[in-house]
């Protein structure tokens, strides 16, 4: 099976989270979680771990409870391998379910590197949305032809 994954930048991760409805207040925590769990690697798969489980994708979603290997299932009703590609919208949906059920404390990487460690939280306030970037490029394009 060929997996198409990528290493996200902090700003790419922040944009994906924002586009998926994550509150701006928590985006730094989510990006820190993603960095601590997977290094922002969307195709990372680790295992076997406890109960022969594997962890998938940028959030390291575990096959023991949240998804099933080779078929849809688990609490997120998802195929684990789908969390190991460059489309993280499904990963975010499942991670939101995990967070709403168990909190950020579910992820040991977040507990060790992000919790009570405000200095470790990435500053993503300077990240521009794609719409803002497109607008800036369009303005430069118009200015080029205005002279």
Q: Over which residues does each language-model region extend?
A:
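Conserved helix-loop-beta core of C-type lectin(-like) domains
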Residues: 28-35, 40-62
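Generic signature of intrinsically disordered, low-complexity, basic-rich segments
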Residues: 9-10, 24, 46, 132, ...
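A near-ubiquitous, low-amplitude feature marking generic local secondary-structure context
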Residues: 13-17, 44, 71, 77-78
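Catalytic and binding regions of secreted/periplasmic enzymes and modules that target cell-wall glycans
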Residues: 49-147
């Amino acid at each position: 099976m060929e997996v198409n994954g990528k290493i996200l930048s902090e700003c790419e991760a922040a944009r994906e989270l924002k586009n998926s409805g994550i509150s701006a207040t928590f985006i730094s925590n989510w990006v820190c979680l993603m960095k601590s769990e997977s290094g922002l690697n969307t195709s990372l798969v680790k295992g076997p771990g406890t109960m022969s489980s594997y962890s998938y994708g940028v959030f390291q979603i575990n096959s023991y409870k949240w998804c099933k290997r080779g078929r849809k299932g688990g609490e997120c009703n998802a195929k684990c391998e789908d969390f190991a590609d460059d489309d993280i919208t499904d990963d975010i949906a499942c991670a939101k379910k995990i967070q709403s059920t168990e909190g950020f404390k579910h992820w040991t990487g977040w507990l060790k590197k992000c919790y009570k460690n405000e200095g470790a939280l990435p500053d993503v306030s300077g990240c521009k949305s794609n719409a803002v970037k497109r607008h800036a490029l369009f303005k430069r394009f118009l200015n080029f032809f205005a002279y």
